Amino acid sequence: MNLLLDTHILIWALNEDSRLPEKAKEMIMDEDNAIYYSTVSIWEISIKHANHPDNVEFTGKELAQFCQEAGFLPVEMRDKHVFALETITRAEGAPPHHDPFDRMLIAQAKAENMSFITHDALLPYYEEKCIIPV
């Protein structure tokens, strides 16, 4: 299975953080799965590090390097991902969600036929089969 990791799952996996859910850990460790990270996550961390360097421990460049060292594969943003963004649906009455990075990651997973691994409680409200909450 091709797994695209949400930014927080990516960071928790790289840091061996105790917040990484066991299900996510098992999926990442499964040798039958290919693990992907997105340039969208690199972009997100770059912005957060620039705005709050005391709260975000590394730069986007460092995150990309850690991902490569871990053997994770990159997914670069392409036009078809932006077009997929226009097709994402959200459940009626769902709580508000305004994170453009999350939406683009979902669009990438959808466009690339990947499973998107997240621990964000707001994301399962998107009616997209690619989302796997852990």
Describe every region a protein language model picked out.
Residues 1-37, 53-65, 121, 125-127:
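Short, well-structured N-terminal submotif of metal-dependent ribonuclease cores
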Residues 6, 44, 102, 120:
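Acidic active-site catalytic centers that drive phospho-/nucleotidyl reactions
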Residues 7-8, 45, 85, 109:
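Generic structural signal for small/hydrophobic residues in well-ordered secondary structure
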Residues 16-17, 48, 88, 129-130:
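Residue-level signal for well-ordered alpha-helical positions
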Residues 36, 75, 132:
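General small-molecule cofactor/ligand-binding pocket signal
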Residues 57, 69-119:
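Active-site neighborhoods of divalent-metal-dependent phosphate/nucleic-acid chemistry enzymes
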Residues 111, 115-117, 121-134:
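Charged phosphate-binding loop/patch that engages nucleotide di/tri-phosphates or the phosphate backbone
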